Amino acid sequence: MKLSKKNIIHLCVLTGIYLLFVLALTRFKYAYGSELDWGGQHYAIPDYFRKLFYKTGDFFPSFAPNIGCGENIYNLSYYGLYSPIILFSYLLPFVKMSTYIQIVSIIGIIASLWIFYIWMRQKFTDNTAFALSFVFLFSAPLIFHSHRHIMFVNYMPFLLLGFMAIEDYFEGKRKYMVTLWAFLMLMTSYFFACLLYTSDAADDLI
């Protein structure tokens, strides 16, 4: 879909509002995230994945010798073991993981916002798409978890693209895209996805 000048203005305004929220939260001196949880988990464990890869050269390790007394590394999959977002950091070993996680968290919300707006614009008027996107941006789960528990929201761009791809699928367009976005979404949070395949968990979800 080609964006009009008004669409671009809407996206810039929405992005600006979100960045002002980030600025108000951090005030140029605080981390965009929970210093307690992120310092001990969301920074530290992905950084351990990256360091272990560079130390061993093993892309599929099975054991984390330096966590506790050593444990199965898949116990830590909750923290993005094969998430495409975390894997990209392997290409940037010179960037501190604390900096990287904050940046990708902010970029992830902006990407989700833009994708949602474009999706809504395909169905509604410009102003309605803007209003819906504003509500989406400041929905409590999205805005809260973006700086508290990133694994609950970092799959969002892939989920939205997956929804758009499903619509394309039923219209006979680009059928393979559903598989692509679903794969990336599941790799981002496959720790939770596996629960769908257990009968007890499925009953609880229903």
Tell me the role of every PLM-derived stretch.
Residues 1-25:
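Start-transfer (signal-anchor) and selected internal transmembrane alpha helices
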Residues 12, 103, 130-134, 176-180:
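Hydrophobic alpha-helical transmembrane segments
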Residues 18-113, 134-157:
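Membrane-interface coil-to-helix junctions
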Residues 113, 117, 121, 159-168, ...:
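Hydrophobic transmembrane alpha-helices
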Residues 116-138:
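Transmembrane-helix signature of polytopic, membrane-embedded enzymes
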Residues 138, 142, 170, 184-192:
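Transmembrane helix irregularities
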Residues 162-177, 185:
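Membrane-interface transmembrane helices that cradle and orient dolichyl/undecaprenyl
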Residues 197-206:
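Single conserved hydrophobic/aromatic residue that forms the stacking wall/gate
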